[in-house]
Amino acid sequence: MAYVSMKQMLETGVHFGHQTRRWNPKMRPYIFGARNGIHIIDLQQTVKLYRAAHDKIVETVAAGGSVLFVGTKRQAQEAIATEATRAGQYYVANRWMGGTLTNFSTIQKSIERLNRLETMFSDGSVNRYQKKEILTLNREMDKLELTLGGIKNMERLPQLIFIIDPHRENIAVKEGRKLGIPIMAVTDTNCDPDLIDYIIPGNDDAIRAIKLFVTAMADACIEGEALQKDTKNKNLEEELKQIATAECNKESTSIEQELIIASEQTETKENNIEESVSEVVITNESELITE
């Protein structure tokens, strides 16, 4: 398990918050001080809280859950899309559509539409339409891909949401809280930490700082996936052992039953022989007496 170090956080500027005039007083416990009108985040707390968040992601994925990565600001888009894909998770990197979670059944219809359009273009069936109609369908597909591409394979709601800048992604936060989905977020000094279940105090504007955390959380997902596979393999081995043991017990019981039956048959034969011998002896004695 490789955690991000405090040195890495310093090198990527995680400790730089917003201007002191643009702050949320609720973030006071996570602020070390101020320098040149900029709040400085207490990295000792960031390290501790980041590790707790990292472990939560590992635990969630290891248990078979999924994580939704959210970051639509320009600085976060590339890292969110790239790292979530690498980890085999879902993401929203462009625009959060209202109801993405709270109205998931309707969103799924749009996803189905996107999948149908992609199929039409891939198998060539779109060619039966006129050129103008094809252009219209292509624009529709591109638009849907832009907003839903990162969740088009998401068949059920995620078990955890990881957010860059919850102040900007306030709708995603509200939807997650309404559905009881845990929220984890890189939270700058202008955010409300009370809305976040797993807070990671840090710079949510610098590209390097964002990439550091997004990559770390993607690694945590991969780690959890590996643990999940190990658990499945162990469970499979245990099941196979139980089956083998049951078969052995069944075979042993069958052999014991066969031995008992054979023993009973032998005993019966011996009794029959004894009875036959007795009958012969009695017959011979009777003949001798008669003579």
Swiss-Prot record:
What is one GO biological process annotated to this record?
translation
Q: Name one Pfam family in it.
A: Ribosomal_S2
The record, for CDD domains, names: RPS2 (cd01425)
Domain of life from the UniProt record: Bacteria
Q: Per its UniProt record, what InterPro entries does this chain match?
A: Ribosomal_uS2 (IPR001865), Ribosomal_uS2_bac/mit/plastid (IPR005706), Ribosomal_uS2_CS (IPR018130), Ribosomal_uS2_flav_dom_sf (IPR023591)
Q: Name one GO molecular function term.
A: structural constituent of ribosome
Q: Which GO terms describe its cellular component?
A: cytosolic small ribosomal subunit
- Keywords assigned by UniProt? Ribonucleoprotein, Ribosomal protein
Leader peptide range in chain numbering: none
Q: HAMAP family from the entry?
A: Ribosomal_uS2_B
Which NCBIfam families does the protein's record reference?
Answer: rpsB_bact (TIGR01011)
What family does this chain come from, according to its entry? Belongs to the universal ribosomal protein uS2 family.
Q: What is this protein called?
A: Small ribosomal subunit protein uS2
Species of provenance: Lawsonia intracellularis (strain PHE/MN1-00)
Gene behind this chain?
rpsB
